[in-house]
Amino acid sequence: MRHGKVHRKLNRTAEHRKAMFANMCAALIKHEQIVTTLPKAKELRPIVEKLVTLGKKGGLDKRRQAISEMRDLDQVRKLFGVLAPRYKDRNGGYTRIIKAGFRYGDNAPMAVIEFVDRDEDAKGKDSGPTQESEAA
């Protein structure tokens, strides 16, 4: 019986799910908008909302909790330095999910998950490694 089982398995092991959502959290914080499948977006939303709430609370212990959840120091800095002040007056509801049709190939339902009041210039900026960062 599935009583009390609230999360989707997404056909992955627990370690794979944890790593996938850590990467997706970092990507969403970096670009402030990502396209993924609808079930993944629905599972990602509460994780990101809790991270933004950690950022709003501030403090070293909350920063360490965010680092252990996300494992990307640059995005944790952005979370605490940019996103937390942006949403300081908002009580939850930091993200929205917009259905985006179906994927060609397997007809999977797609969705766009983005931050409410997001920075339009953040999308696509600094995607992937650059030669300056590899040389340094």
Swiss-Prot record:
What is the protein name for this chain?
A: Large ribosomal subunit protein bL17
* PROSITE patterns registered for this protein in UniProt: RIBOSOMAL_L17
The GO molecular function terms of this record are: structural constituent of ribosome
Q: Supply the alphabetized keyword list.
A: Ribonucleoprotein, Ribosomal protein
Q: Which InterPro entries match?
A: Ribosomal_bL17, Ribosomal_bL17_CS, Ribosomal_bL17_sf
Q: How does it assemble?
A: Part of the 50S ribosomal subunit. Contacts protein L32.
What protein family is recorded? Answer: Belongs to the bacterial ribosomal protein bL17 family.
One GO cellular component term of this record is:
cytosolic large ribosomal subunit
| Gene Ontology biological process terms, A to Z | translation
- Supply the gene name: rplQ
